[in-house]
């Protein structure tokens, strides 16, 4: 039996506005497996939110095929489920948004209860479930508070509890942390990770922030202008991006752009000696364990002056990055570069010394 829970094949979504045709999503194919925390990342207008609305047919595609679990929901230009079946299928998918969409005149308890208004549970069973959900999101003591009495993070926790009320298999997060401060964002992401593990929940993260993808996701799709640019494991995408936009997202998340701007302003780099190179090194996995700069100095007499360094853990794999000035005899520097690449380290020359 396939472990794929969301299967999008060749999805097109087209709108017509004022006699103008807009293709919001163009021939996108994605497979998401049960238990994934899957990121769909792109700038505003990339088509990511439109695509994800098609997953539960809040937006009907123009073409392609969508399978959720064992059910084909859309194919050959037509919805494949009856109205009742579609409603039941949507209950297997919870959604949370940037704006929490809580009812201001209802308490946290009542907001969660609203999602169970069509449930066949008894009142006693509903009460037990609501209180259990509020405890799950660490809001058991806030059940009687109104939204105005809650912080942004607490409001999002209520929204998450409400989204889980009908025991969904999938939780879609559409920019759910965009309105939150960095500390609260980390807390919400940690909660989503816990729910993923405790409930076996498949989480789809729609975001424009690669940092969120790095923090929580195991797989990612990068979108631009309605098209899928590249897709893969977070480790593969971060360690070896194939597209310029992906590289841009990664550099923003790592802070390398700002670091390079400051590095290039340093006198050492501005007046780089003729014998020197400014290089960027990327390490993945076991290659982070080697004292590489020590080795190339010992073997080739080439010095390495570290101007920037960063090591992170993606999944269980360390990924490191260094910006280094290598200096030595020309032939020795060339030999050192080859040794670095042979060690499995990605290398990019940023600047050559003045000749």
Swiss-Prot record:
Keyword annotations: Amino-acid transport, ATP-binding, Cell membrane, Membrane, Nucleotide-binding, Translocase, Transport
Record Pfam families: ABC_tran (PF00005), NIL (PF09383)
Positions of the ABC transporter domain: 8-250
Reaction(s) catalysed by this chain's protein: L-methionine(out) + ATP + H2O = L-methionine(in) + ADP + phosphate + H(+); D-methionine(out) + ATP + H2O = D-methionine(in) + ADP + phosphate + H(+)
An annotated GO cellular component: plasma membrane
EC number from the UniProt entry: 7.4.2.11
One GO MF term: ABC-type D-methionine transporter activity
Keyword Magnesium: no
Annotated residues for binding of ATP: 42-49
Cellular compartment(s): Cell membrane
Top-level taxon in the UniProt lineage: Bacteria
Keyword Cell membrane: yes
Physiological role: Part of the ABC transporter complex MetNIQ involved in methionine import. Responsible for energy coupling to the transport system.
PANTHER family: AMINO ACID IMPORT ATP-BINDING PROTEIN, METHIONINE IMPORT ATP-BINDING PROTEIN METN
Protein's recorded name: Methionine import ATP-binding protein MetN
């Amino acid at each position: 039996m396939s472990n794929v829970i969301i299967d999008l094949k060749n999805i097109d979504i087209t709108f017509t506005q004022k006699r103008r045709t807009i293709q919001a999503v163009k021939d996108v194919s994605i497979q998401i497996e049960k238990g994934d925390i899957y990121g769909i990342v792109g700038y505003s207008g990339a088509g990511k939110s439109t695509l994800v609305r098609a997953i539960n047919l809040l937006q009907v595609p123009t073409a392609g095929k969508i399978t959720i679990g064992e059910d084909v929901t859309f194919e050959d230009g037509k919805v494949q489920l009856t109205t009742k079946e579609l409603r039941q299928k949507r209950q297997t998918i919870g959604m949370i948004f940037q704006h929490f969409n809580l009812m201001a005149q209802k308490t946290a308890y009542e907001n969660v209860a609203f999602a169970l208004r069509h449930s066949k549970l008894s009142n006693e069973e509903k009460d037990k479930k609501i209180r259990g959900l509020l405890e799950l999101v660490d809001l058991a003591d806030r059940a009687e508070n109104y939204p105005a009495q809650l912080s942004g993070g607490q409001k999002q926790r209520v929204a998450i509890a409400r989204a889980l009320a009908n025991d969904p298999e999938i939780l879609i997060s559409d920019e759910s942390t965009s309105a939150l401060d960095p500390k609260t964002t980390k807390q919400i992401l940690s909660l989503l990770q816990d729910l993923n593990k405790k409930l076996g929940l498949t989480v789809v993260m729609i975001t424009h922030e690669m940092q969120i993808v790095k923090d929580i996701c195991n797989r990612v799709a990068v979108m631009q202008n309605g098209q899928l640019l590249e897709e893969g494991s977070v480790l593969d995408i971060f360690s070896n991006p194939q597209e310029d936009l992906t590289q841009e997202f990664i550099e923003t998340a790592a802070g390398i752009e700002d670091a390079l701007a400051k590095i290039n302003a340093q006198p050492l780099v501005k007046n780089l000696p003729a014998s020197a190179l400014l290089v960027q090194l990327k390490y993945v996995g076991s290659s982070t364990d080697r004292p590489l700069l020590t080795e190339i100095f010992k073997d080739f007499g080439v010095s390495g002056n570290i101007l920037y360094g960063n090591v992170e853990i993606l999944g269980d794999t360390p990924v490191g990055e260094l910006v280094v000035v290598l200096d030595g005899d020309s032939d020795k520097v060339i030999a050192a570069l080859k040794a670095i690449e042979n060690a499995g380290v990605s290398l990019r020359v940023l600047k050559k010394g003045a000749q």
